[in-house]
């Protein structure tokens, strides 16, 4: 289910103080990066991903990450993407 504008705004505010937990390197979005993002989303629900120079531009890399994982792209600001996937149970974001 897509996020509403209000939900995106709340997630952006919560994600402001987060540090990137996954870094996309020179190889771009690979299977290993997608697996790392999925694991981080399982652990944290809301994550930042740092996108360095690579074969794709930052918009393409962020889209690949959101399509390759069950995550929603909340924001792309510069080279940092904010991704969100709500857990089915035990979610910290039940009030969204």
Q: Where would I find each of the regions flagged by the language model?
A:
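Positively charged, polar, low-complexity stretches
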Residues: 1-96
């Amino acid at each position: 289910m897509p996020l509403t504008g209000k939900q995106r705004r709340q997630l952006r505010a919560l994600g402001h103080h987060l540090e990137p937990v996954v870094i996309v390197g020179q190889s771009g979005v690979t299977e290993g990066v997608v697996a790392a993002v999925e694991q981080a989303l399982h652990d944290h629900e809301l994550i930042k991903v740092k996108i360095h120079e690579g074969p794709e531009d930052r918009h393409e890399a962020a889209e690949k990450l959101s399509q390759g994982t069950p995550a929603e792209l909340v924001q792309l600001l510069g080279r940092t993407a904010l991704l969100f996937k709500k857990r089915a149970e035990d979610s910290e974001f039940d009030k969204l």
